[in-house]
């Protein structure tokens, strides 16, 4: 009888999970600053993505800038919808099936317990998507998975977070004093 080895756990992803658990559990000390490096964030994304999007989403990668981020992944939108239990009509299914490289560029602004994520640019299979087509994709694919998501509009940060800074080196989460 062969023994099954437990799947390897990435300690960098575990580090992010521990930090988020402290913040979300209300155990963060007033004035604390939590640093999540770019390497940790990418490790966490690789572990977390299959839990959040079980089908049709592979090879996530995040490149951070000064209050910006580029996200990359291979996405099969039809499989993503199927995995979320969303029905797709035949015509739309034929248009969206198949895995495509996707790049999303966003700008991040945060202060006084609030934040806004501004979607700057989306590329699907090398084609830039914008305007009403981008709005359609957000309504059809993103919002059904995350109905409470806010894009291009401010939202309250949770768990006593004052603000979040994004730099090429990583993300700093500041807890209110």
Region locations from a protein language model:
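Extracellular/lumenal and peripheral-membrane lipid-interaction modules
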Residues: 3-177
